[in-house]
């Protein structure tokens, strides 16, 4: 094996990393009324549900067949192995937060089967091991022969992430050793002077970086960079007839292979692939010390956030190829905005924050998390959206599972990691990025700081943070002041508030007002802190009208509603059976009202709308005033399918 050193020694030897360090989700205990129930539903419902679905659909049986524990043909798509790994990662994170002997045994049993399915040299791709002569369509006739399509590297990238999570949760090496054995095979196979190629679906780069973090072995990070650097330089591999269903993989734009990654300045192609690639590039920038990678993803960020992101934080406009569209191409009814793309975007935004320490990335992260990401899972945790459009004529409903089931497993692994997005540390500074009720123990410059954050966010903008160092100590607390509270729904000019708000932001320590002098979007409070100190932040939450950049043709003459970080929508069930016939007047007033019995407890917006007959171009004819109710976008389609609208025709009067 390549890895001979002790894992801890490898970690200690790192010289480069992200300048900002996130506080691990294992150090943060979420207890608020918004996120805590979602995390518990994921633990108690969604993770077991997804584990069972992997059994029912033959995904786990594929490993048993590869291990010769049972006979039969491979079932499903060539990438189905990855769904097993992703749910295992989510289960491992869940174990860290909530020890569960039965869940651990289930993971142990799966790991044992995966180990038996692995070939002697480390290769792990069940469809080829089961029947080397007839693997699933797209797998290629030989190992690595069809990397654009096969997902051989994508699958094991998710395996590396799951194995790292399992090791961190249990301290046991059973899964990690399987991952290392496979990664060592990749190191022997690919690289300068060896086999050329790149993964058709990015992900292995992230997984290799995680293995590097755990082992300290530079070959893993070098290989991640090699795969990225091959893009735009290597054009080999199998090709397809234009009528072949796999012909889309011949498109270099679809795979982000149209230019070298360091020259790319526009997000193109498959959105999930792009998000995973950008996140992987951030890892190389930080862990490898390559500033040119940071410069490249900074350019790409300007393009995505400035021209290609939905108000909900979703990305990927086209259902054809699940891809980005042109600049400002953001249709609502046909928006693809895949749940996996939202998760990938969140992973990327967090890495950009860790690189730069700027609140604008946390602003985008918050928008994604509270809107276009959690819309992907139902409130009961048992049905899902693959796509997350911003308009529906009633044809969209949630599904219990999918043949291409990447999104539900991705939800299971993201949600338990949410506590890890709240705080971060840089030198003698503590960052407070998300306002999620919790208790935490955070180490700042060698001192342990007990924190208690209390809030009803996102329904209320009052935030109280009790700061308790083990002994009096001087350090800085950087509190993010959200862009939405500073007249900016998003960084840049893709979206703006149509109405002004002069409601102040109030910040105090122990009851004494503190002036807010923003630095990269943070209110910075540096003082000698002692037990019992309390920070109070008050963010006003008026209902705001949002307008899109004039170049976004789909939103021309329309407005959306936002309060705090939450984007709202109207559903037909609350508005006389229809939502697409509603227009909103500039003079209409909306009031926020908390309804504890609705949709697990939400704030709704009530007011008046004009209802009439909708027509092409979004105009409403013969409008009449009627009562109007809007709910948070993330909660739509939890009461059955029906009409839904985010962007409403605007009546200027």
Question: Model-derived features: where do they sit?
Answer:
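C-terminal beta-rich recognition modules with glycine/proline-rich loops and embedded aromatic residues
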Residues: 224, 297, 363-371, 376-468, ...
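Well-ordered alpha-helical scaffold segments within catalytic/enzyme domains
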Residues: 27, 33-37, 88-101, 157-172, ...
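C-terminal motif of bacterial Sec signal peptides marking the signal peptidase cleavage site
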Residues: 9-10
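Extended extracellular/luminal ectodomain segments enriched in beta-structured repeat modules
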Residues: 471-477
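Solvent-exposed loop and edge beta-strand segments that line ligand/cofactor-binding
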Residues: 16-19, 66-84, 137-155, 188-201, ...
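Extended ligand-binding groove/face enriched in aromatic
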Residues: 67-79, 85, 89, 95-202, ...
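Low-complexity, Ser/Thr/Pro/Gly-enriched N-terminal "stalk/linker" regions
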Residues: 13-83, 108-134
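Non-catalytic carbohydrate-binding regions of carbohydrate-active enzymes
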Residues: 288, 292-336, 342-397
């Amino acid at each position: 094996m390549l890895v001979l050193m002790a894992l801890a020694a490898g970690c200690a030897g790192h010289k480069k990393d992200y300048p900002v360090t996130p506080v691990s989700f294992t150090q943060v205990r979420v207890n608020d009324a918004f996120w805590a129930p979602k995390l518990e539903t994921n633990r108690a419902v969604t993770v077991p549900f997804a584990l069972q679905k992997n059994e029912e659909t033959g995904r786990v049986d594929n490993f048993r067949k590869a291990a010769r524990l049972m006979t039969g043909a491979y079932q499903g798509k060539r990438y189905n192995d990855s769904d097993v790994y992703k749910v295992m990662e989510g289960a491992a994170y869940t174990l860290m937060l909530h020890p569960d002997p039965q869940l651990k045994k289930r993971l142990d049993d799966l790991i044992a089967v995966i180990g038996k399915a692995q070939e002697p040299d480390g290769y792990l791709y069940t469809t080829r091991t089961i029947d080397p002569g007839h693997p699933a369509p797209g797998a290629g006739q030989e190992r690595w022969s069809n990397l654009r399509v096969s997902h051989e590297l994508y699958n094991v990238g998710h395996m590396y992430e799951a194995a790292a999570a399992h090791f961190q949760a249990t301290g046991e090496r059973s899964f990690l050793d399987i991952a290392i054995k496979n990664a060592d095979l990749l190191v022997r196979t690919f690289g300068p002077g060896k086999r050329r190629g790149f993964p058709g679906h990015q992900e292995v780069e992230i997984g290799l970086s995680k293995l590097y973090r755990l082992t300290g072995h530079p070959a893993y990070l070098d290989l991640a960079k090699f795969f990225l650097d091959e893009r735009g330089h290597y054009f080999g591999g199998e090709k397809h007839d234009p009528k072949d269903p796999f012909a889309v993989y011949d498109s270099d734009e679809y795979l982000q292979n149209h230019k070298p990654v360091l020259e790319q300045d526009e997000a193109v192609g498959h959105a999930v692939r792009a998000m995973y690639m950008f996140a992987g590039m951030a890892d190389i920038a930080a862990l490898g010390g390559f500033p040119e990678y940071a410069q490249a993803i900074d350019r790409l960020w300007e393009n995505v956030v400035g021209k290609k992101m939905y108000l909900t934080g979703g990305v990927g406009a086209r259902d054809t190829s699940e891809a980005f569209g042109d600049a400002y191409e953001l249709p609502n009814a046909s928006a693809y905005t895949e749940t996996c793309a939202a998760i990938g975007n969140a992973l990327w935004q967090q890495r950009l924050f860790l690189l730069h320490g700027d609140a604008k990335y946390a602003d985008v992260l918050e928008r994604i998390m509270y809107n276009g990401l959690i819309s992907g899972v139902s409130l009961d945790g048992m049905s899902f959206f693959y796509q997350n459009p911003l308009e529906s004529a009633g044809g969209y409903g949630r599904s219990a599972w999918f043949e291409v089931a990447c999104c539900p497993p991705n939800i299971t692994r993201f949600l338990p990691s949410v506590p890890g997005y709240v705080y971060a540390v840089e030198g003698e500074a503590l960052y407070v990025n998300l306002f999620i009720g919790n208790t935490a123990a955070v180490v700042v410059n060698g001192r342990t700081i007990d924190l208690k954050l209390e809030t009803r966010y996102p329904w209320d903008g009052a935030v109280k943070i009790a700061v308790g160092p083990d002994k009096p100590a001087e350090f800085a607390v950087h509190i993010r002041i959200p862009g939405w509270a500073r007249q900016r729904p998003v960084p840049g000019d893709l979206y703006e508030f149509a109405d002004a708000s002069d409601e102040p932001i109030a910040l105090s320590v122990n009851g004494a007002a503190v002036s807010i002098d923003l630095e990269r979007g943070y209110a910075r409070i540096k003082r000698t802190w002692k037990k019992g100190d309390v920070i109070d932040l008050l963010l006003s939450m008026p209902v705001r009208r949002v307008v899109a950049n004039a170049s976004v043709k789909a939103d021309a003459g329309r407005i959306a509603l936002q309060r705090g970080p939450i984007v709202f929508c109207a559903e037909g069930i609350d508005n006389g059976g229809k939502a697409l016939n509603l227009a909103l007047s500039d003079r209409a007033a909306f009031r926020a009202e908390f309804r504890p019995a609705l949709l697990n407890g939400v704030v709704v917006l009530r007011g008046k709308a004009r209802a009439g007959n909708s027509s092409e171009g979004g105009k409403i004819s013969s409008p009449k005033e009627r009562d109007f109710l809007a709910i948070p976008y993330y909660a739509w389609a939890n009461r059955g399918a029906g009409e839904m609208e985010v962007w409403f025709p605007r009546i200027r009067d």
